[in-house]
Amino acid sequence: MSAVNWVFTLNFAGEVPVLSFDERVQYAVWQHERVNHDHIQGVIQLKKKAKMNTVKNIIGGNPHLEKMKGSIEEASAYAQKEESRVAGPWSYGELLKKGSHKRKIMELIKDPENELEEPQKYRRAMAWSAMDESRKLAEEGGFPYTLYSWQETVLGLLEEEPNDRIIIWVYGPNGNEGKSQFGKFLGLKKDYLYLPGGKTQDMTYMLMKNPKANVVMDIPRCNSEYLNYQFMELIKNRTIFSYKYEPVGCIINNKIHVIVLANVLPDYEKISQDRIKIIYC
C-alpha cells in the first residue's frame, strides 16, 4: 500500500522525540499529546507516493501509520487539536491542498512521461518549481554575500515610494562588481521581475504574468548596444501591451521601481536625462 498523505502516532516515554524531515516531505504537522500515555500525533504529506515502511523510516521511531482517509486540511486540523495537547504543534514545509495549482504542478513533474505527452506544460512546471525553490532559499537566507556600498544605496532607494519617472541605472564598466548576483537576488522576490534584456514583445509578454511587479533589467555586456529604451519608458509610464501569441494589454495606476544593471552609461539621445538616476559601482 502506497500513498502521499498519512496520519501517524508515535508513542514514547521520557523526552519528546525530535522529528526531522528531508526533501521527500512536502508538509508535516505534529504535536505532543497525552491521553492515557504520551505520544506524538501527526500528519505527513509526501511529494510522491511511498509505501508504509518507507514512511516509517522517514518519520523514525517505528510509528503507527494509517493512510489518510479524509482531506489533508481535516487531518491537519485534527493533528493540532487543543484538547489533548501538551506541547506544539510543530510543522515542516507547506501544505498542498487537493486541486491547488501547486499540487497540479507537482503531479505533472512527478511523472517523466508527461515530458513527452505535454512537453510545454512539463517545461513550464519544471521552471516554476525551480523558481519557487530558489525563492524560498532567498527568503530564508537573504543576500548570500557582503553588500557593496552601491548595493546598500540601491536597497535604500527601493525602500522609497516609486514615482512615474526615475529609472535606477547601476553602471559598472569593469564587470565582477556584483551586478548580476544582486539582480538575480532581487528577481527572486515575489514583487520583482528579472529580465536579461530582450525585444519589447518578449519582455512585455513576461511582464503580463505579473504586471504590477518592479522590474530588474540585467543587461549582458554583449547586448549593451541593444538596450531597449522603449520598454523602459513603456513600463515606467505603466502602459503594458503584448502582441506575442495573443494581444493583451493594460494601463496600470500603480508606480514601480525599474532598475537597469549595465556595463554602459545610458544614451541620452534615446531617453530623457531627467529620467535616469545613476548609481556607480
Curated annotation (Swiss-Prot):
Which ranges belong to the motif RCR-3? 78-81
Report the subcellular localization: Host nucleus
Where the record places motif Nuclear localization signal is 48-69, 95-101
Reactions catalysed according to its record: ATP + H2O = ADP + phosphate + H(+)
Instruction: Give the matching InterPro entries.
Output: CRESS_DNA_REP, Helicase_SF3_ssDNA/RNA_vir
**Binding-site residues for ATP, renumbered to this chain:** 178-180
List, alphabetically, the Pfam families matched: RNA_helicase, Viral_Rep
Q: Name one GO cellular component term.
A: host cell nucleus
Which positions fall inside the CRESS-DNA virus Rep endonuclease domain?
Answer: 1-95
Which Gene Ontology BP terms does the record give? DNA replication
Q: Where is the active site?
A: 78
Recorded E.C. number(s)? 2.7.7.-, 3.1.21.-, 3.6.1.-
Where on this chain is RCR-2 (motif)? 39-41
Give the signal peptide, or none.
none
Q: Which domain of life is it from?
A: Viruses
How many and how are cofactors bound here? Divalent metal cations, possibly Mg(2+) or Mn(2+).
For the motif RCR-1, what are the positions? 7-10
**GO terms for molecular function, please?**
ATP binding; ATP hydrolysis activity; DNA binding; endonuclease activity; metal ion binding; nucleotidyltransferase activity; RNA binding; RNA helicase activity
Coiled-coil stretches are none
Amino acids binding a divalent metal cation: 33, 39, 83
What extra comment accompanies this record? The genome of nanoviruses is composed of six to eight segments. In addition, some isolates contain subviral DNAs.
Domain comment from the record reads as follows:
There are 3 rolling circle replication (RCR) motifs. RCR-2 is probably involved in metal coordination. RCR-3 is required for phosphodiester bond cleavage for initiation of RCR.
Q: What's its job?
A: Initiates and terminates the replication only of its own subviral DNA molecule. The closed circular ssDNA genome is first converted to a superhelical dsDNA. Rep binds a specific hairpin at the genome origin of replication. Introduces an endonucleolytic nick within the intergenic region of the genome, thereby initiating the rolling circle replication (RCR). Following cleavage, binds covalently to the 5'-phosphate of DNA as a tyrosyl ester. The cleavage gives rise to a free 3'-OH that serves as a primer for the cellular DNA polymerase.
What is the protein name for this chain?
Para-Rep C9
- Could you tell me the gene encoding this protein? C9
